[in-house]
C-alpha cells in the first residue's frame, strides 16, 4: 500500500520516504462490512463509518505508528505480531518482539535507542512537533544515499540548509551546499567540488526571487540546454541573445556603405550649391573674366572632393594627389550649375578630363581647399543650427500658447457644462415644484369638492372665492408653463451659440496650426525670407487669441449674468406666488381648525360632565365606606368596653372576697401563715380547709344586667381614600394616623356605673371563687414584686400599648420611643463622634431622632 501523502515534506528515493520500505513478512488481516481492512496494523484501522483511526506502516526493523492525520508519531520495536480480533469493537492486541530497548517521549516520538545491530540505525533520528526529521546523532549509513543527520528544516518542513557532509547522493548535486529562501526555493550554493550527471554545476547557479536562473557565471561550463555561459535575460526572464566570448571579434563584417555623417554632409552641400561655399575664391579674381570656366571646374572638382572632408581628422588618412583618383559619387537628382559638364568631368571613367588645355589651368591643392572651406562651412553650419534652434523655440512657445488657449477653452467648456448642469438642475427643481404645486392644487380641489359635497347649499361668496381661486391657479399653471418654455429656449439658444463659437474657434486653430506646419516645413531660404512675416503673423495670432479669450470670457460672463437674472426673476415670482398661495392655505386651514376645535370642545364638555358624574359617584361610595368603617369601629370599641367592665367587676369581686376572708381569719384567730396564703391567693385557686371543695369547671352566674347609657356620638372623619366594600389594612390605618395625627374614630366616653350602696358582709357562695385560670392575668400592682431592670422580653403589655398609641401620636414617634427604651446606645464616648463619625453607623440600628435629643 502506497502512502505518499503521509510524509510529503520528506525527500527520498523514487517518491518513498524512509518509513515506506516494506518487507514481505505481512501478517493475515480481515475486512469489515464496508470492505476496509481492520485487523492488519501494517495497513490501517478504520471505524464503522470508514474513517481512518490509526495506521501503522510496516518496515524491516520497526513498526511505525501514525496519528489521525497520517503523520508519524512513534515507533514500536519488533516485527512479529500475533493478531486477536474483537468481533464487536474491531480491536486488536499486539505482542511485539522486543528486539530493541526503544525510548519514547510524551508524544510517542523515538528519542533514543540502546546500541543495536541493524543496518539502519533509527535510534539516532530526531523529529520536530510536525513529525519532520530535524537532526540525527552520529550514526551509520542508510539506504537513502544521503546523510539525514546533516539536514535542517524550517517551520514549514522545507530544507533550509545542511551542515558539512561527505556523503555523495544519486540526485546529481550536493545537498550540503544548497541554500533556500523562506519559501523553500533554492537561492544559491556555496562552492563545491562534487561532479554531477546533469551537465552543469549547481554550485555556480544563482536564482532570482521567483526561483529562475538569471545568469551563469562559469565560462567553461555549459548547461544541458546547449547554449553557452554568456546567456542573458531581460527583466521578464526572457532570453535576449546567445553571445560567445569571441563572437564580436569574429563576426565583424566590413560594410561598403557610406557613414551617416558623410551622407548628411553630402546632402547639405548639394542643397547649398548656390551659396557662398562655391564663390569663396572670387574675391581675388574678379578682374579676370575668362576664368569663369576654371572656377566652374574648380567648383566641380571641389564638389567631387567634398565627400572626403569627413576623413580629414582621421590619423590614417593618406594624402590625395592633385590628379583625381578617388571615386566620385553624385546624386541622381543633382543639377549642376555649369554649362559645360561634358568638358569638365567624365563620370563613366571616374576621371576628370580637361579639354581646355590651352587655357591656363591653376591646380590648387586639395588640402588648401579643405583648410579654406572648413571654417566657413562650420560657421554656416553653426548659424543654421542656431536658426533651427530659434525656430524650434519659437514653435515651442507658439505651441505653449496654443496649449494655454486650449486649456482656457476647456475651462470655458467646463464652465458652460456646469452652467448647463445648473440649468438642468434648476429645471428639474422647477418641475418638482410644479409637480408639488399640482399635487397641492389637486388636494385643494379635492378638499373643495368635499366641502361642496358636505355643504349642499353653499353661499355665493364661497362660490365666487372658489371660482377666483380656480382662475388664479389656472393662471399660475399657465405662467409656470411659459417660464418653462422660456428657460428651455434660453438654454437651447445658449447651447447653440456656444457650440457655434466653439466650432469657429476650433476651425481657426486648425487653420493656423496647418499654416504653422507648412511654414515650418519650408526650406532654409523661404524660412529666412518669411521670418519677419511669421513674427508679424504670430503677433497678430497672439492678439487674435487674446481677443478670442476676452470675447469668450465676456460671453461667459453675459451668459452667467443672464442665467442669474432669469433665476432671480423666477425665484422672486415664485416666492410671491407661493406667499399668496400660503396665505390662502392658512386661511382655509384656520377655518378647518376652528371647526374642529368647536367639535372637540363640545365632545370635551360631554366627557367632562361624564367624568364629574363618575367622580361624584366615587366620592359618595368612599364616604359610605368611611361611614361604615366608623360604625364598625364604634361597635368594636363598645364590645371592648363591655369586656373590660366585666373583667373589672370580676377583679372587684375577688378583692371583696379576700377582704371578707381576712375579716373571718381575724375573728377565728387564724395562724399568720394561713393569713398570708389567703392574701397571696385572692382568687382562691388553692382550696382552703374551711371552704368546701368546688369543681373548677363550674359555670359562673350571669352578670347583672347593666343599663345602656345614652351614647353621645362625636362627629366622625370620613376617609376619602377608602374604596366601597373594602376593609382598611393596618398600613392604611397607620398612614392615615400619621397624616392626620389623630384617629379616624376618636375614643368615645366610657359609660360610668351608677354608685351602689356598700353591701353588707354576708356569706358568699363558693362559686364566685371558681374562675378559669386563663381569663384574666394577675396585675402587677396587686402583688408586691422586687424592682427589676427593663428587659426586652418583659413588659410586653407596655409595648403593645405603645403601638396602639401610634394611632394618636404617630408611628415614627412610637418607634423612636421603643428604640430609646429597649436599645441602649452602642458607645458612651462622645469624643468618637468628632474623630470617627462612622462608629455611629457600626453600632446597632439607624436612629430616628425628630427632637434632636442626642
Curated annotation (Swiss-Prot):
It is found in: Cell membrane. Residues 91-109 are annotated as: Fibronectin-binding. Residues 311-320, 411-428 have a biased composition (Polar residues). Residues 746-764 have a biased composition (Pro residues). Residues 384-622 form a coiled coil. The keyword Membrane applies. Residues 1-24 have a biased composition (Low complexity). It is a peripheral membrane protein. Residues 1-33, 247-327, 411-434, 743-766, 835-854 are annotated as: Disordered. Residues 258-267 have a biased composition (Basic and acidic residues). GO terms for cellular component: plasma membrane. Keywords: Cell membrane, Coiled coil, Membrane, Repeat, Virulence. Absent in high passage extracts (passage 164) versus low passage (passage 14) due to a 17 bp duplication that adds a premature codon. Binds immobilized fibronectin, specifically the gelatin/heparin-binding domain. This is Fibronectin-binding protein PlpA.
Amino acid at each position: 500500500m502506497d502512502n505518499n501523502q503521509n510524509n510529503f515534506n520528506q525527500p527520498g528515493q523514487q517518491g518513498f520516504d524512509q518509513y515506506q520500505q516494506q518487507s514481505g513478512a505481512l501478517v493475515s488481516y480481515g475486512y469489515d462490512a464496508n470492505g476496509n481492512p481492520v485487523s492488519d496494523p501494517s495497513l490501517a484501522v478504520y471505524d464503522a463509518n470508514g474513517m481512518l483511526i490509526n495506521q501503522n506502516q510496516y518496515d524491516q526493523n520497526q513498526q511505525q505508528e501514525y496519528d489521525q492525520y497520517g503523520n508519524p508519531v512513534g515507533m514500536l520495536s519488533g516485527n512479529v505480531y500475533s493478531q486477536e480480533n474483537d468481533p464487536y469493537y474491531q480491536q486488536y492486541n499486539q505482542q511485539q518482539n522486543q528486539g530493541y530497548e526503544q525510548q519514547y517521549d510524551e508524544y510517542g516520538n523515538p528519542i533514543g535507542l540502546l546500541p543495536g545491530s541493524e543496518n539502519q540505525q533509527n535510534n539516532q533520528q530526531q523529529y520536530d512537533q510536525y513529525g519532520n526529521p530535524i537532526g540525527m546523532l552520529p550514526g551509520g549509513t542508510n539506504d537513502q544515499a544521503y546523510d539525514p543527520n546533516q539536514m535542517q528544516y524550517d517551520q514549514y518542513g522545507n530544507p533550509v540548509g545542511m551542515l558539512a557532509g561527505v556523503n555523495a547522493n544519486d540526485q546529481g548535486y550536493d545537498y550540503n551546499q544548497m541554500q533556500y529562501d523562506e519559501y523553500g526555493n533554492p537561492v544559491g550554493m556555496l562552492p563545491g567540488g562534487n561532479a554531477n550527471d546533469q551537465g552543469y554545476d549547481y554550485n555556480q547557479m544563482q536564482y532570482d526571487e521567483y526561483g529562475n536562473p538569471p545568469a551563469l557565471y562559469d565560462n567553461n561550463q555549459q548547461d544541458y540546454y546547449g547554449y553557452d555561459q554568456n546567456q542573458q535575460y531581460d527583466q521578464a526572464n526572457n532570453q535576449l541573445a546567445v553571445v560567445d566570448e569571441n563572437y564580436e571579434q569574429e563576426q565583424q563584417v566590413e560594410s561598403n556603405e557610406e557613414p551617416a555623417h558623410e551622407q548628411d554632409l553630402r546632402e547639405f552641400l548639394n542643397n547649398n550649391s548656390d551659396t557662398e561655399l562655391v564663390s569663396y575664391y572670387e574675391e581675388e579674381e574678379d578682374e579676370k573674366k575668362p576664368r569663369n570656366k576654371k572656377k566652374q571646374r574648380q567648383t566641380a572638382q571641389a564638389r567631387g572632393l567634398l565627400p572626403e572632408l569627413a576623413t580629414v581628422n582621421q590619423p590614417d588618412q593618406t594624402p590625395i594627389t592633385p590628379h583625381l583618383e578617388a571615386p566620385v559619387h553624385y546624386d541622381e537628382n543633382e543639377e549642376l550649375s555649369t554649362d559645360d559638364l561634358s568638358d569638365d568631368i567624365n563620370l563613366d571613367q571616374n576621371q576628370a578630363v580637361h579639354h581646355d588645355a590651352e587655357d591656363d589651368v591653376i591646380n590648387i591643392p586639395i588640402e588648401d581647399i579643405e583648410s579654406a572651406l572648413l571654417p566657413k562651412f562650420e560657421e554656416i553650419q553653426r548659424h543654421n543650427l542656431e536658426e533651427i534652434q530659434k525656430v524650434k523655440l519659437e514653435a515651442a512657445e507658439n505651441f505653449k500658447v496654443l496649449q494655454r488657449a486650449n486649456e482656457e477653452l476647456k475651462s470655458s467648456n467646463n464652465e458652460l457644462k456646469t452652467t448647463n448642469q445648473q440649468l438642468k438642475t434648476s429645471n428639474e427643481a422647477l418641475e418638482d415644484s410644479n409637480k408639488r404645486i399640482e399635487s397641492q392644487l389637486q388636494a385643494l380641489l379635492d378638499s373643495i369638492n368635499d366641502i361642496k359635497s358636505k355643504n349642499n347649499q353653499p353661499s355665493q361668496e364661497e362660490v365666487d372665492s372658489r371660482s377666483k381661486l380656480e382662475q388664479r391657479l389656472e393662471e399660475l399653471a399657465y405662467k409656470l408653463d411659459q417660464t418653462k418654455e422660456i428657460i428651455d429656449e434660453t438654454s437651447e439658444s445658449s447651447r447653440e451659440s456656444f457650440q457655434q463659437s466653439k466650432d469657429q474657434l476650433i476651425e481657426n486653430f486648425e487653420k493656423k496650426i496647418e499654416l504653422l506646419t507648412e511654414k515650418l516645413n519650408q526650406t532654409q531660404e523661404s524660412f529666412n525670407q518669411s521670418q519677419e512675416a511669421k513674427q508679424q503673423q504670430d503677433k497678430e495670432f497672439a492678439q487674435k487669441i487674446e481677443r478670442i479669450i476676452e470675447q469668450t470670457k465676456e460671453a461667459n460672463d453675459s451668459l452667467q449674468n443672464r442665467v442669474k437674472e432669469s433665476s432671480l426673476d423666477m425665484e422672486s415670482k415664485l416666492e410671491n406666488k407661493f406667499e399668496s398661495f400660503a396665505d390662502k392655505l392658512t386661511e382655509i386651514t384656520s377655518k378647518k381648525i376652528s371647526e374642529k376645535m368647536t367639535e372637540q370642545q363640545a365632545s370635551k364638555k360631554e366627557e367632562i360632565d361624564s367624568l364629574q358624574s363618575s367622580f361624584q359617584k366615587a366620592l359618595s361610595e368612599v364616604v359610605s365606606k368611611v361611614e361604615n368603617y366608623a360604625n364598625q369601629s364604634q361597635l368594636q370599641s363598645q364590645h371592648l368596653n363591655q369586656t373590660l367592665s366585666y373583667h373589672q367587676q370580676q377583679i372587684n369581686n375577688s378583692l371583696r372576697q379576700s377582704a371578707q376572708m381576712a375579716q373571718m381569719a381575724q375573728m377565728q384567730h387564724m395562724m399568720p401563715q394561713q393569713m398570708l396564703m389567703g392574701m397571696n391567693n385572692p382568687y382562691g385557686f388553692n382550696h382552703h380547709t374551711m371552704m368546701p371543695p368546688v369543681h373548677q369547671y363550674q359555670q359562673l352566674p350571669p352578670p347583672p344586667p347593666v343599663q345602656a347609657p345614652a351614647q353621645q356620638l362625636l362627629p366622625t372623619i370620613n376617609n376619602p381614600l377608602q374604596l366601597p366594600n373594602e376593609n382598611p389594612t393596618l398600613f392604611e390605618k397607620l398612614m392615615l394616623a400619621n397624616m392626620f395625627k389623630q384617629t379616624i374614630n376618636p375614643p368615645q366616653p366610657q359609660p360610668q356605673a351608677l354608685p351602689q350602696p356598700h353591701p353588707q358582709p354576708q356569706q358568699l357562695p363558693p362559686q364566685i371563687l371558681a374562675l378559669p385560670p386563663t381569663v384574666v392575668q394577675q396585675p402587677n400592682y396587686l402583688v408586691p414584686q422586687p424592682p427589676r431592670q427593663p428587659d426586652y422580653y418583659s413588659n410586653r403589655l407596655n409595648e403593645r400599648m405603645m403601638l396602639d398609641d401610634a394611632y394618636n401620636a404617630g408611628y415614627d414617634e412610637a418607634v423612636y420611643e421603643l428604640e430609646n427604651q429597649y436599645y441602649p446606645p452602642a458607645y458612651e464616648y462622645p469624643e468618637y463622634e468628632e474623630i470617627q463619625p462612622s462608629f455611629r453607623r457600626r453600632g446597632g440600628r439607624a436612629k430616628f431622632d425628630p427632637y434632636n435629643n442626642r
